Amino acid sequence: MATRRQPLIPGWLIPGVSAATLVVAVALAAFLALWWNAPQGSWAAIWQDSYLWHVVRFSFWQAFLSALLSVVPAIFLARALYRRRFPGRLALLRLCAMTLILPVLVAVFGILSVYGRQGWLATLCQSLGLEWTFSPYGLQGILLAHVFFNLPMASRLLLQALENIPGEQRQLAAQLGMRSWHFFRFVEWPWLRRQIPPVAALIFMLCFASFATVLSLGGGPQATTIELAIYQALSYDYDPARAAMLALLQMVCCLGLVLLSQRLSKAIAPGTTLLQGWRDPDDRLHSRICDTVLIVLALLLLLPPLLAVIVDGVNRQLPEVLAQPVLWQALWTSLRIALAAGVLCVVLTMMLLWSSRELRARQKMLAGQVLEMSGMLILAMPGIVLATGFFLLLNNTIGLPQSADGIVIFTNALMAIPYALKVLENPMRDITARYSMLCQSLGIEGWSRLKVVELRALKRPLAQALAFACVLSIGDFGVVALFGNDDFRTLPFYLYQQIGSYRSQDGAVTALILLLLCFLLFTVIEKLPGRNVKTD
């Protein structure tokens, strides 16, 4: 009896293997390009370079301080946000989530407008007869920017841990008379301490790989990170060998941080409770005052830079800047790259999760985890490292392309995959648990299942993942910093040129347009499924 030949690779495994192979091949190609261009001389001489060790020490030191200054206040801010209900609370929580995807140069421009030598606070001090001595450049400026980005994110993540505490535990603690320190120690701390290490590791990794912030606010050789040293080696000194060596060092450090972060990141099961959001009726005055002060301080950290971008952007140069063709060319380039990178990112992410889901359904858990980890691998190669590898690879083979669209789109798509994975991972598993048996009984599989089940049931998560990927791409500066020129500008690159040439009023208009574009793009894409979309 004739039987149909079985394929070497099952059809359901092809999407994930293809996407994983692409990601791993790109990472490997970039690594080999860096390795081949690394100096072949005595490595001992390199390790004895005092400036190199200063750069490495500063990279770790600023990342450690940034993580510390972000996580410790976030513990108390998260507790305040959990205990208090006030008008605008949901808007504040949404703003906390948005700071992660806010374009770095926009935030930097707002920080300079508030804390700079001629900023709002300097003007206020001058009117009061006081001297403003704070400088937003150097280590203190870098820390301020990193706290601006990461404190809200840490607060949001720790707030989720507090919301997982069963209401019965809180009620029992109140009945036993536990207050203040004892309540924090015995009820809240056991839940927080499981979330703090992975949050701190994530923030440390993000700050260690920070590029645009250090480039804009670094105070010269004393405040230089490894990524900035890579950029300087290629853009100013044109020393590919040194850039390759620094990129390899950065990649090794980031790989270690990624593995540490994955090791610390353990899912916290929500507590089983019948009392959702239970609040202690014995709410003391000093507790309300402390929480109010913390929330007001958080607002004073977040709102002034954003308001400064809006207020400073509406200036007398607005009509002239809007009439410049260069601005609209940069805007179109940013939009084109962001949409293409976002779609490519979501497609690759779905390919990984599709095959991973099938592997898990067949009890091949380890293989499924390996497939998903291939998408997280790109975190070990920050954008500037990946772009450096591409730069050296192309420069030594076919030459640099006339248009950098393809490289920037592809790199930005890869850099956004870890974020898209986090958005789509759990919804994809929920869909599997809900519809898998039904699809098997009806014989729905492959493309038909994707069209009938996944694309309908995942409309909201897909839109959210696409919005995150697009906004992350539109605000990226690390990759464009290497390939950007007068013929290829994105809005962040154009803003950096304006800041560098001291055209502050023109830059304020560009920063405002970039801020509005990001919020508009995120909102429009997130609302694409519609408010009353049916996912059943």
Language model features by range: what are they?
Residues 163-192, 359, 437-458:
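Short helix-to-coil transition segments within interhelical loops
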Residues 45, 90-93, 126, 167-175, ...:
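Short amphipathic alpha-helical coupling elements at transmembrane boundaries
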Residues 34-45, 116-128, 218-227, 268-275, ...:
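Peri-membrane helix termini and adjoining interfacial loops of integral membrane proteins
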Residues 270-281, 361-362, 528-536:
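Short cytosolic juxtamembrane segments of multi-pass membrane proteins
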Residues 7-41, 50-163, 191-216, 245-262, ...:
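Membrane-water interface segments at the C-terminal ends of transmembrane alpha-helices
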Residues 4, 263-294:
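Flexible interhelical linker loops that connect adjacent transmembrane helices
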Residues 171, 179-182, 268-282, 317-318, ...:
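Juxtamembrane inter-helical linkers in multi-pass membrane proteins
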Residues 113, 212-238, 476-504:
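Glycine-rich helix-loop "coupling/hinge" segments at transmembrane-helix boundaries
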